[in-house]
Amino acid sequence: MALSSTAATTSSKLKLSNPPSLSHTFTASASASVSNSTSFRPKLTLTRLSSSFLNPSTILHLTPSQRTNRPSSSPFTVRAARGKFERKKPHLNIGTIGHVDHGKTTLTAALTMALACLGNSAPKKYDEIDAAPEERARGITINTATVEYETETRHYAHVDCPGHADYVKNMITGAAQMDGAILVVSGADGPMPQTKEHILLAKQVGVPSVVVFLNKQDQVDDEELLELVELEVRELLSSYEFPGDDIPIVSGSALLALEALMANPTLKRGNNQWVDKIYQLMDEVDKYIPIPQRQTELPFLLAIEDVFSITXRGTVATGRIERGLVKVGDVVDLVGLRETRNTTVTGVEMFQKILDDAMAGDNVGLLLRGIQKIDIQRGMVLAKPGTITPHSKFSAIVYVLKKEEGGRHSPFFAGYRPQFYMRTTDVTGKVTSIMNDKDEESKMVMPGDRVKIVVELIVPVAIEQGMRFAIREGGKTVGAGVIGAIIE
């Protein structure tokens, strides 16, 4: 994901740039280039952070050998942000999806910098979003990273989803949190394999609305070619049951907008054609993606996405609240993968700000009393006591993808053992029986079939009737289903 040769020198004091729910590895470099070149990138000691649950100041040191290459030998200081989160605007979770190298992270950086001009976000450079060293080295995003920004009418948490095929697992987690998505497609290349897979996954995990950004417009000389790409994108979205003809499509160049904003961070609307495209995109997002109805009246449930251990404070679980409310002092159950146990919430935080209570749709970190890091893992859920139980056997209605949709080329039979992706977990399961539309036992399932199956998972997971899941095998999605009944 080559961006620019413009080097952005990080200041000697960095604030934490990410909320507790994102990937936990933070790095910084003394001269962190925004390019994908092999320029010097010193790696800091990798440290797991979760902002205001930390001591007020956490120091990250460069190793002595790395320090010699730097202009100054002073260590970076990462300070925890403080303060309260105030709900002045509706909160939405959106994200960038699309093929690797089409410009998702560049667009995310351009969005935060453009909205920072209006005083509505903290600007994030490209390399602050693509934070982990292996991502920066390969120029690709692996873990989903989250930033926040505001428009005039809304507050957004923005997930930058990976486009690299190896890391679709993390993209599923990111997509499962979205109220809407910005699909980034290179105007020069058109839709590519991961473009299709991301649209399919967005449909499977229930992303309700999509807005399209046709990137790299500056690289397309022929206006007709851009129109053909737009037509192709609309047809592709329609083929996955999105309203392709109605979806807003904005074309522009995230890179030229980002470079303009880095050269002049005070650029306002009307001063630069490429920056104006970024504002136009957010206008469309504000108009087209509806404010979701949050299920605040239902019992609390949060699927754990990541876990941090903070010395002298305890263990923090992060994730998006699926339903209900939670506040400090609430007792919650820890369900799935292991024996159910309960704990008390001793801290609630979102985007480095303390919350009195958190509600459905919020990306939060919850500090838990008496829980060790080894007791808790991604894929478990935190829930109101007694409202959800772990199960390992269920029946489901499943659609098996055709070869043309990226699915299997051959049928599968009873005894098939793929991976089942549910909320933030993936667990191996065995298909023990297959029934056709008439509830008659069937021997095999062909790509393109819609069948009823019974599944036995190798470990119990917190599941419910009506829950959606994806079936994956060998690095690709082969099916999607809905749980019909819990058996045991």
Curated annotation (Swiss-Prot):
Upper classification of the organism: Eukaryota, Viridiplantae, Streptophyta, Embryophyta, Tracheophyta
UniProt-listed Pfam families: GTP_EFTU, GTP_EFTU_D2, GTP_EFTU_D3
Region G2, residue ranges: 139-143
Subcellular location: Plastid, Chloroplast
Residues engaged in binding GTP: 98-105, 160-164, 215-218
Gene3D superfamilies xref list: P-loop containing nucleotide triphosphate hydrolases (3.40.50.300), Translation factors (2.40.30.10)
Keywords: Chloroplast, Elongation factor, GTP-binding, Nucleotide-binding, Plastid, Protein biosynthesis, Transit peptide
Region annotation Disordered: where it falls in the sequence: 1-20
Chain residue ranges for the region called G4: 215-218
Induction section of the entry: Induced by light, low temperature and salicylic acid (SA). Repressed by high salt and abscisic acid (ABA).
Keyword presence, Transit peptide: yes
Annotated GO biological process: mitochondrial translational elongation; translational elongation
Extent of the transit peptide: 1-79
Protein family according to the UniProt entry: Belongs to the TRAFAC class translation factor GTPase superfamily. Classic translation factor GTPase family. EF-Tu/EF-1A subfamily.
GO cellular component, one term: mitochondrion
Organism of origin: Pisum sativum
Name of this protein: Elongation factor Tu, chloroplastic
Major localization class: plastid
PROSITE patterns, sorted: G_TR_1, G_TR_2
Gene from which the chain derives: tufA
